[in-house]
Amino acid sequence: MFAPAVMRAFRKNKTLGYGVPMLLLIVGGSFGLREFSQIRYDAVKSKMDPELEKKLKENKISLESEYEKIKDSKFDDWKNIRGPRPWEDPDLLQGRNPESLKTKTT
């Protein structure tokens, strides 16, 4: 007796027919997505070997150490060479003669 009354209510009331299943889908989907996204975070939390972790901590590279490496380098004697466009010949543009680049075999 209870089932026909419920089915009749679903057919007559659009909120019960469309709204409740939609809300169940949204709420259930959010719980499902939470489980799938938790897998991603669990995979990232992998343990590292302690010896390897010590080596990585010793080899820290800082901005100051890199600056000290290139501080004494000279960058004043460089030449700006424009790269060729797709329709240009790169050998002629850069001052190289294509005939002189070919090796002569006799």
Curated annotation (Swiss-Prot):
Superkingdom field: Eukaryota
Membrane-traversing stretches: 15-37
Disordered: annotated span: 77-106
Mitochondrial matrix membrane side: 1-14
UniProt main location, coarse: mitochondrion
Locations listed in the record: Mitochondrion inner membrane
Mitochondrial intermembrane-side positions: 38-106
Membrane topology classification: Single-pass membrane protein
One Gene Ontology cellular component: mitochondrion
Listed Basic and acidic residues bias regions: 77-88
GO BP: any one term: mitochondrial cytochrome c oxidase assembly
InterPro entries, per the entry: Cyt_c_Oxase_assmbl_COX16
Tissues expressing the protein: Widely expressed. Expressed at higher level in skeletal muscle, heart and liver.
Pfam families per the UniProt record, alphabetical: COX16
Keywords associated with the record: Disease variant, Membrane, Mitochondrion, Mitochondrion inner membrane, Primary mitochondrial disease, Transmembrane, Transmembrane helix
Subunit record text: Associates with the MITRAC complex. Interacts with MT-CO2/COX; specifically interacts with newly synthesized MT-CO2/COX. Interacts with SCO1, SCO2 and COA6.
Disorder this protein is connected to according to its UniProt record: Mitochondrial complex IV deficiency, nuclear type 22: An autosomal recessive mitochondrial disorder characterized by hypertrophic cardiomyopathy, encephalopathy, fatal lactic acidosis, and isolated complex IV deficiency.
Family (UniProt): Belongs to the COX16 family.
Note: No COX16 mutations have been detected in patients with cytochrome c oxidase (COX) deficiency.
Protein name: Cytochrome c oxidase assembly protein COX16 homolog, mitochondrial
